[in-house]
Amino acid sequence: PVWSVVTVDQSKPYTITGAPRVIKGKVIIGNGGAELGVRGYVSAYDANDGKQLWRFFTVPGDPSKGPDGAASDPAMEKARGTWFGDNFYKMGGGGTVWDAIVYDQELDQLYIGVGNGSPWNHKMRSEGKGDNLFLSSVVALNPNPGKYLWHYQGTPGETWDFTQTQPIMLATLKID
């Protein structure tokens, strides 16, 4: 089947720099552009017809607008308490998933690596307070229906572009 779908809001300066991943009948794709003031997310589309199955935002949006109606809504309730002020949602928040997406078949978990904040300066973005979940985190999702499972944040309050967007490798190692 051949289909085409626009995966980003074209009124904002999103970019797409990573390849999609295909798992379990789904095409998974993130986006880039945190440095340009966008809000990050990863989306799953039906591999047969391109219909969006779910979306997981990586940073909270404007609280006055309420939940997004996305798979990430429960996780965003948790994340919202780690952000302060209102600059982050006015300036995008960042947290794009522009490359690091990998699927663990054994655990049936999708791992996404989340990028930098927007604006980059923690003091401007969140009054210099809070961990700013899920910036610079590896987030594990259930690939059906995109439900949050767990996360590890490598750089709380990320300001230095120490992101988790490098390729994620899964390996079984014997360590003595």
Model segments located where?
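Asp-box/WD-like beta-propeller blade repeats and closely related beta-sheet repeat scaffolds
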Residues: 1-43, 47-48, 52-88, 97-98
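Conserved short loop/turn motifs at secondary-structure junctions
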Residues: 33, 127, 154-157
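Beta-propeller blade signature
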Residues: 40-52, 127-146
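Surface loop/turn motifs at the tips and blade-to-blade linkers of beta-strand repeat domains
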Residues: 9-11, 91-93, 153, 159
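Short, small-residue-rich loop/turn micro-motifs
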Residues: 56, 60, 114-117, 142
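Gly/Pro-rich turn-and-neighbor structural signature
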Residues: 146-152
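Short Pro/Gly-enriched beta-strand edge/turn motifs at strand-loop
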Residues: 80-86, 119-124, 151
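Repeat-blade elements of multi-bladed beta-propeller folds
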Residues: 15-35, 39, 90-125, 137, ...
